[in-house]
Amino acid sequence: MKGREYEDLAARYLKSKGYQILGRNLRSPYGEIDILAEFEGRKVIVEVKGSETFFPAEKVTPHKLSKIIRTAYEVLGEEPFSIEVVVVYRGKVYHYKDLGLEL
């Protein structure tokens, strides 16, 4: 699988859980938002990581989260949002909702 395929799988998974996909690959000078969604009336920034050889959750570093947050503020302004991570590892989806980041 390649990056786009991981994001496609993540988007299908999120839709199956009731998320509305609002945008994908949204860029700012600070970085990129893989998926912008809405769930139960709130905006959700979803970072997608995938790998077939190692569990990729370690790629979501504090530096990466900082870039995601700056990009989210650039895209959403002052609108509240949360950040979630979807990891695709060997074809299985892992969804991390509660990162303690309700901004």
UniProtKB/Swiss-Prot annotation:
Intrachain S-S bonds: none
Any single Pfam family the record assigns to this protein: UPF0102
Coiled coil: none
SUPFAM superfamilies, per the entry: Restriction endonuclease-like
GO molecular function: nucleic acid binding
Protein family membership: Belongs to the UPF0102 family.
Protein name in UniProt: UPF0102 protein aq_041
